[in-house]
Amino acid sequence: MTTNYIFVTGGVVSSLGKGIAAASLAAILEARGLNVTIMKLDPYINVDPGTMSPIQHGEVFVTEDGAETDLDLGHYERFIRTKMSRRNNFTTGRIYSDVLRKERRGDYLGATIQVIPHITNAIKERIIEGGEDHDVVLVEIGGTVGDIESLPFLEAIRQMAVEVGREHTLYMHLTLVPYMAASGEVKTKPTQHSVKELLSIGIQPDVLICRSDRSVPNNERAKIALFCNVPEKAVISLKDVDSIYKIPALLKSQGLDDYICKRFGLNCPEADLSEWEQVIYQQANPVGEVTIGMVGKYIALPDAYKSVIEALKHAGLKNRLTVNIRLIDSQDVETRGVEILKDLDAILIPGGFGYRGVEGKILTAQYAREQNIPYLGICLGMQVALIEFARHVAGMQDANSTEFVPDCKYPVVALITEWRDEDGNVEMRSEQSHLGGTMRLGSQLCHLADDSLARSLYGEATILERHRHRYEVNNMLLKHLESAGLRVAGWSGDHKLVEIIEYPDHPWFVASQFHPEFTSTPRDGHPLFAGLVKAAGEYQKRAQK
């Protein structure tokens, strides 16, 4: 199989939406029957995003094989059926780490290690490895053309055209075409200068994606084509839209997929975008709306909860309901009380780390339990629900997690020190373990209890869900919690770790140790989120009576 490569770069400014554009194009190509995958190359020095602040970087997206990756991989999985893996995302830090390890081992036989060829060769090797067994691989280069950090990646993809053949490589460049209100026209000069910067590196773009708040007029597209040495049909206008799921149809309407298939000599049928048309129809035709409060500590940057927010929207599609998400700082709950939680149809507490804001989350879980408000807890959201239950129902007033109070009287949540991974290998951790790459990560088997709400939502006895955490329910105290009314609705594959808890006396109270948001998609949704939104609609109807 010959793999074709589409390299996606961005210019003028950051945050143009390279990831969304790449994912949308991949969705069209997949709809034409092609085997497609997407890679993200990040120029920062961190080995991976696992220890980066969510406020700076946004969420860490966890793949099936346990890689902690850029949030763009979440977009990729939401747009195409191909599952991402650790091969789909790597950083400058990872490349340098690998090269230096080989140098220390003596693999380079005493050679002087340089950016060219050693770093660029390592980048190319990873790109080729990630694209194996695929018809098309889209490779998104993080950052903006002109950044010093991106230069090794740009040099590597320039060399790729020489090594795999220009007929199997295509350079797609996203650029800003701003609208000037004073003159009433769009300006193409920033695009011209961005392309000039790429040309100075040795890369001639084949496709230009022109980002603007409005459609770029045909005469301006012709001007861009002339000055940037790109066919006019390869200058694509990508205006702002109210839903990212409209972008595949927008790109297809301008013939981008046809142009690329002809460029690569691929003979494939027309794209069937009927599934995306259904998604857009569901978005545009809700029969009602609900308000769900998401209580967290990173709400200053909503991208810190990107997959959770998208999963709630997907659940809205499945229930034909518009989901209004109210972001609530858990510290505000501590200082202002549960009054700020009123008028919510459901409550969700997502994952997180550290003690800041935890007591506000515990108050939130208590409020949801006592007021019979639908509740979904994820990771830390399950742990705070457990702590709240232990304190106020099971009579364990000093209950806590050893993450927050190491010597607490009732450590209902404690550090996992030993477990088996998905391959059966024993993993061990301690309080002294490094933070990076030392959590229980990736897709894990979960057995659902026969009489549980979770079993009825999933419709099957065993499921696979993704994890990212160090702390677990302390089984030593579990019997006391169960005798007080707690139900364990899901166990790990070896039946040793609690994965889901429920409160049978509550209309809808589910909390999971895993992260269900990572497997939700606009076309399929996710059972837990769909169940939460449905329960929110039912709660709203009861409250209005």
Swiss-Prot record:
It is an enzyme of class 6 (ligase). CTP binds at S14, D147, I148, E149, K187, T188, K189, P190, T191, Q192, K223. Belongs to the CTP synthase family. Mg(2+) binds at D72, E140. UTP binds at S14, K187, T188, K189, P190, T191, Q192, K223. This is CTP synthase. CTPSs have evolved a hybrid strategy for distinguishing between UTP and CTP. The overlapping regions of the product feedback inhibitory and substrate sites recognize a common feature in both compounds, the triphosphate moiety. To differentiate isosteric substrate and product pyrimidine rings, an additional pocket far from the expected kinase/ligase catalytic site, specifically recognizes the cytosine and ribose portions of the product inhibitor. PROSITE patterns: GATASE_TYPE_1.
